Design a protein with these regions (language model features):
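Active-/binding-site microenvironments in catalytic and ligand-binding cores
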Residues: 1-210
Length: 210
């Protein structure tokens, strides 16, 4: 059973949101104003897909990988487990082996490693590639983090991205889990129906479960 109300775990999108160094900064502007045309305000958004809270499609790191429109939409809705792993330099089997994850399909990891989301971090606790096989065997199909990537920020190989995809695990990044306690929740974090895209912004929300 669900308890209480939905909790927004998405980054707010405005000029203060951090972007990958060299990537497109977020901007919103009104192209047609009600004052000028007498009817409506019509805005335009310009942003990188990998800004704020977003999902990665395999095409992001694999030219032959699935695009957003090809992803199983049900993976982004349903029961999720939130766990806390603060003060880690990386996250692997050793960090998770003492946590019971049987029956968990969607795993959200709160690291508390990215405090000021108006500034892109210098380093993050990345996912160790061998964790993918371990999580897959447990039945995990979606991993979410309060970080901009699952790999080291200077990685060119993106080994964790590839291993997760090879084991059927989808990636959700940039969550805001600061006030979320460990436990079981209902998650909704739906990507847009982007036909050619390598990722999508999402509005991620949680509701506590009994």
């Amino acid at each position: 059973k669900c308890m209480g109300t939905w909790i927004d775990i998405s980054q707010r999108l405005d000029d203060n949101v951090a972007v990958w160094p060299g990537d497109t900064p977020f901007s919103y502007k009104v192209n047609w104003s009600k004052e000028e045309c007498g009817s409506v305000n019509v805005g335009q958004i310009n942003m990188s897909i990998h800004t704020g809270t977003h999902i990665d499609a395999p095409f992001h790191f694999d030219d032959d990988g699935k695009r957003v429109i090809d992803l199983d939409i049900e993976l982004y809705m349903g029961n999720a487990r939130v766990i806390h792993l603060p003060n880690k330099t990386s996250i692997g089997v050793d960090e998770l082996s003492s946590i019971d994850l049987q029956g968990v399909t969607r795993l959200l990891i709160r690291t508390d490693a990215w405090k000021d989301r108006s500034v892109f971090p210098q380093t993050i606790p990345h996912i160790q590639p061998e964790l993918a096989a371990y999580l897959s065997e447990l039945g995990v199909r979606l991993i979410g983090l309060d970080l901009p990537s699952v790999d080291p920020l200077d990685s060119k190989e993106l080994s964790a991205h590839h291993e997760l995809a090879d084991h059927g695990i989808h990636i959700l990044e940039g969550l805001v889990l600061d006030d979320i306690g460990p436990g079981n929740y209902e998650l909704a974090a739906l990507p847009l129906p982007l036909v050619e895209a390598d990722g999508s912004p999402v509005r991620a929300v949680l509701k506590k479960l009994h």
